[in-house]
A protein has these predicted regions:
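A short glycine-rich, His/Asp/Glu-containing loop-to-beta-strand
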Residues: 3-36, 94, 98
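Short acidic-glycine-tyrosine-enriched beta hairpin
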Residues: 30, 58-79
Length: 136
C-alpha cells in the first residue's frame, strides 16, 4: 500500500556552492575482483551496496561492507574500492555534482598511471537532474 523508507545514512551538505548543480542517481557494478583505482569525485554522495561485497579504503582506513552497507564519499577525498573476489558487486549512489557534468563521468583518477588502465566498473545513470541551491 504505501512505500516505507528509513534513513540509512545522512550527511550535511552545508559546503555546497549556491547556484546550478546536478543531482545524479546511478549504480556502479563490478565483476568479481574488480576495483576502482584511487580516485576522487567532483561532488559528495551517499552510496549503498545492493549486491556482493566491497572494501572502501579512504582517510587511511579500510571498511568492508556487505549488501545494505552504506557509506559517504565527500568528493575531493581519495578513495580506492575493491570488490569481492568471488561474486559480482553493485552499489547505488546519489551525488551532488557541478551542473557541467550532465551526462558525463564525475570520476577523477589520482595516479596518472591508473588513467590508462582498463576499468572493470560499469555505470548506469538512472537520473541526471539539474537543481538549484538557493541562499538560506
Amino acid at each position: 500500500h504505501g512505500v516505507a523508507s528509513r534513513t540509512k545514512l545522512a550527511a550535511p551538505l552545508d559546503h555546497l556552492p549556491q547556484g546550478e548543480l546536478l543531482l545524479r542517481g546511478d549504480s556502479v557494478a563490478f565483476p568479481p575482483d574488480g576495483c576502482a583505482y584511487l580516485h576522487t569525485h567532483q561532488g559528495p554522495g551517499l552510496r549503498c551496496l545492493i549486491e556482493g561485497g566491497i572494501r572502501i579504503d579512504t582517510h587511511g582506513h579500510s571498511t568492508s561492507l556487505g549488501p545494505g552497507g552504506a557509506w559517504f564519499e565527500a568528493g575531493p577525498v581519495p578513495v580506492f574500492a575493491q570488490a569481492a573476489s568471488d561474486r559480482q558487486s553493485r552499489f547505488i549512489r546519489v551525488m551532488i555534482l557541478p551542473a557541467a557534468l550532465l551526462g558525463k563521468s564525475s570520476i577523477q583518477y589520482v595516479n596518472e598511471d591508473d588513467k590508462a588502465k582498463p576499468k572493470t566498473q560499469s555505470y548506469k545513470i538512472f537520473a541526471d537532474m539539474p537543481i538549484v541551491r538557493k541562499a538560506p
